[in-house]
Amino acid sequence: ERQTVAVITTMYGFAYVDDTGMVIETAPQIKGVSAPLITGKKVDTLLLGDTIHDQPIRSSLSYLKSLAPELRKDITEINVGNPDNIIAYTSESLPVHLGSADDPAGRAEMTKELLQEVKRNQLSVQYIDTDPRAPLVKSN
């Protein structure tokens, strides 16, 4: 059975998509689904069975798929408004910078490590940057 991994805003409501980018449900309003909302880009019309081809959205879906389930439930939003600086937000409103979300699996692993470091050290953090060349936890 296909599982919703993200919800996308469309011109007429919301599309629930699986990790392949396929629309598995549409609705005029969000109902109690605990999947991240993909924001920053309005998608015209998505019908049941359509597949999303937008690269920033596809990269975001790959990133979500690469996260461990317990970490995935902490991601509430991914903003794809700037395709070169995609930002995921945790349930604690912590921005996680994903760049262009190239290497989604690597960035998912980096997210896990950096969030563990933040929790372990009880850091007060402005944002996390998952750049593989220079990962960063920016403190307040």
Explain the meaning of each model-derived region.
Residues 1-140:
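Charged, solvent-exposed interaction patches on well-folded alpha/beta domains
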